[in-house]
Regions:
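Acetyl-CoA-dependent GNAT
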Residues: 6-75, 86-88, 92, 96, ...
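Extreme N-terminal starter segment of soluble prokaryotic enzymes
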Residues: 2-4
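Conserved active-site tyrosine of GNAT-family acetyltransferases
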Residues: 116, 121, 140
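C-terminal "cap" of GNAT-fold acetyltransferases
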Residues: 99, 106-113, 129-144
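Active-site acidic-Proline motif in GNAT/NAT acetyltransferases
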Residues: 73-75, 79, 107-109
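Conserved acetyl-CoA-binding loop-helix of GNAT-fold acetyltransferases
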Residues: 78-91, 114-118
């Protein structure tokens, strides 16, 4: 069974390592340390038998939120881990009075786009050359 809990400071190194396995343009260790310390950001980790298999961060400012980062270990994908993380992040947002949630996703990331659409996210814009490698991003939004 996957355990979802709040990020702790000691999780940051493992999160940064998993980030490198999941993304071609990973956040740095310093980025994650900043996210954990930020008063507007909530981070969650997913654990399988104590092993870090996923994480997600959401930044909440007044009635808006941004899913800043969400990732699942390649070995644990298609098992509902990403869905559970996103559910918990959205629950956190609702509990804090958020009305709109935004996120960016690579236009080539069909599995993530499908997950987000399943939660009701809609594409509202395209951010041209958003990623360091020049790939576009969809800006997606969800009204809570």
């Amino acid at each position: 069974m996957t355990e979802i809990r709040l990020v702790k400071a000691e999780d940051v190194e493992g999160i940064a390592e998993l980030e490198k396995k999941c993304f071609t343009d990973p956040w740095s260790l310093i980025d994650f340390e900043g996210a954990v310390l930020s008063p507007v950001t909530t981070g969650l980790v997913a654990l399988e038998e104590g092993e870090l298999v996923g994480y997600g961060f959401i930044a909440i400012v007044f009635e808006d939120a941004d899913v800043a980062n969400i990732a699942v270990s390649p070995l644990h994908r298609k098992k509902g881990v990403g869905r559970r993380l996103l559910e918990e992040l959205l629950t956190t947002a609702k509990e804090r009075g958020v009305q709109r949630v935004f996120l960016e996703v690579r236009v080539s990331n069909a599995p993530a786009i499908s997950l987000y659409q399943g939660f009701g996210f809609q594409t509202v814009n395209v951010r041209k050359k958003y990623y360091p490698d020049g790939e576009d991003a969809y800006l997606m939004a969800l009204e809570l």
